[in-house]
């Protein structure tokens, strides 16, 4: 349970610490185990790369985002792109959040662009 990180592209910089302001590009999907073996991530629910959007800027490790992001992003290095698979207890738990049903496993492709 928790967060599993799979590196797509290795970074070459430092990792953020709790309280650091980070800039992140991300795309999020609701995991669908019935279709996972066909290379399907799930149903996309959000992306910072959508037209008119930009990177998310947030203080990491401060509970401003879901626990899976706080833990997963702090394991990344600057410039890294990774897939984070986040179980419900590290996501939104038993509560629905917008387009995300309760008890959903989430998949995020996350790119750590900047650490301030």
From Swiss-Prot:
Entry GO terms, CC: cytoplasm
Entry's EC annotation: 5.2.1.8
Entry's transmembrane regions: none
Activity control note: Inhibited by both FK506 and rapamycin.
The reaction(s) this protein catalyses: [protein]-peptidylproline (omega=180) = [protein]-peptidylproline (omega=0)
Keywords, alphabetical: Cytoplasm, Isomerase, Rotamase
UniProt KW Isomerase keyword: yes
Family annotation (InterPro entries): FKBP-type_PPIase, PPIase_dom_sf, PPIase_FKBP_dom
Example GO molecular function: peptidyl-prolyl cis-trans isomerase activity
Cellular compartment(s): Cytoplasm
PANTHER family: FK506-BINDING PROTEIN 59-RELATED (PTHR10516:SF443), PEPTIDYL-PROLYL CIS-TRANS ISOMERASE (PTHR10516)
Family, per entry: Belongs to the FKBP-type PPIase family. FKBP1 subfamily.
Protein name: FK506-binding protein 1
Gene encoding the protein: fpr1
């Amino acid at each position: 349970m928790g967060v599993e990180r799979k590196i797509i592209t290795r970074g070459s910089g430092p990792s953020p610490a709790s309280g650091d302001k980070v800039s992140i590009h991300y795309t999020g999907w609701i995991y669908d185990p019935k279709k996972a073996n066909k290379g399907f991530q799930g149903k996309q629910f959000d992306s910072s790369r959508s037209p008119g959007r930009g990177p998310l800027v947030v203080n990491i490790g401060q509970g401003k985002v879901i626990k899976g992001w706080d833990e997963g992003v702090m394991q990344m290095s600057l410039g890294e792109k990774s897939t984070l698979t986040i179980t419900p207890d590290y996501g939104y738990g038993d509560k629905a959040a917008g387009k995300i049903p309760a008890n959903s496993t989430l998949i995020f492709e996350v790119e750590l662009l900047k650490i301030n």
